[in-house]
């Protein structure tokens, strides 16, 4: 709820001063949220960015939020020229020694893979149940 209030204040400032173009940094906004709401965060940030020009830097461990950006890339054809993709995903390995930019394909999938322990955990647990 606090996040929504703060975003409302920032949006108000952009309306009062059109030259105001903030960059909002948010650490793990998905904490204590249901998976459906975690994925809706991507919708929220995209909507605020498109309508009010607010830029976001989000630190997340949410597979749901990341997957939602992939779906949004596909549905909105963000990787099809002349469209610009508003999402940039940077992966930091578990040791913090390496980083790389995750590049989206037009179908929303990534060209490269996340490191071990992100997307593969869910699949591995499902296989354990079979």
Outline where the language-model segments fall.
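Switch/communication elements of ASCE P-loop NTPase nucleotide-binding domains
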Residues: 1-127
């Amino acid at each position: 709820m606090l996040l929504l209030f703060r975003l409302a204040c920032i949006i108000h400032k952009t309306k009062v001063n059109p030259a105001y173009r903030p960059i909002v940094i948010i650490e793990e906004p998905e904490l204590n949220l249901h998976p459906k709401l975690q994925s809706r965060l991507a919708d929220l940030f995209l909507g605020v960015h498109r309508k009010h020009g607010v830029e976001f830097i989000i630190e997340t461990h949410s597979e749901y939020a990341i997957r939602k950006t992939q779906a949004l890339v596909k549905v909105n054809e963000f990787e099809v020229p002349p469209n610009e993709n508003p999402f940039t995903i940077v992966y930091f390995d578990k040791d913090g020694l390496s980083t790389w930019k995750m590049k989206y394909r037009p179908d929303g999938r990534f060209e490269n893979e996340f490191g071990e322990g992100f997307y593969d955990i869910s699949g591995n647990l499902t296989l354990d149940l079979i």
